[in-house]
Amino acid sequence: MSDRMIHLVGSIPFRTPAEVFERVGCILGPRLYSIPDGETGERLGWMGWLEPIFAAHPQFESTGQKFTPRASGSEITGKYRLKAGVSPEDVRFDNLPFAQIAMESFREFERVKRTGALPPPVRFQLTLASPISVIRRFVADEAEQEALIPSYGRGLIDEVGKVASVVPHAQLAVQWDVASAVFERLERNVPTRFGQTREEMTRTFAAAHGMLGMGVPSDVHLQFHLCYGDASHMHSIEPATSRLLVDFTNRLRTEVRRTIELVHMPVPPN
């Protein structure tokens, strides 16, 4: 492989995973470490397409509230709450769609690899949004948000296990997207349910993502994409320096007792 590698974060504006693998492979093949399926179709909106997880979940109900993204043209989605009598500890997210989609995309990945458009070392990249981001978007009550993050995280780890039972580990990379729901709070440094100080919040967020990292089999490559958002192609808040990203990564490394193959960070604009 080339000494200068290219990392693709997730969404690629082509129509199908097959088109992503074929076109990107032909252009960037030798420089790729791993390749996502492009999050094509309805998934290009990153999280809006996940609303059915909550709308169809028997333990949730609509609040009638709406979430309006900062990005113009982005999908407006609903807000949900637990039904009366439901404890957050009893909630299971066994209706997640990620494994099924990934396994369908992996079949195309294998086919394109056989044509030679993708070099043998390139791994199939499963990219998953942090529970903190997803729960923040779809759950209205902040106390319920905090309580539901571990349950959703366990559901994601189950999805990783399903994919890892089908995709050869030597061909798989799992990337966790740690987005502005984390870093906007760290930048603003205002007390939240995740901690009264920036240091406390960093510990809380690192522990939550450490659990996700430890849910990836040790012989599957583990990646973290640290993100400040891309609404209308702008960060939700600009990092003054990379210090908070580095602090989070160092804390994360103490929580993840295995190799982290890649950490991707944004940089300050100036």
Task: List PLM regions with ranges.
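Aromatic-lined carbohydrate-recognition surfaces of secreted/lumenal glycan-active proteins
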Residues: 172-178, 220-234, 262-268
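Alpha/beta catalytic barrel-like cores
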Residues: 1-172, 176, 183-201, 214, ...
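Alpha-helix-loop-beta-strand connector modules within alpha/beta enzyme cores
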Residues: 203-217
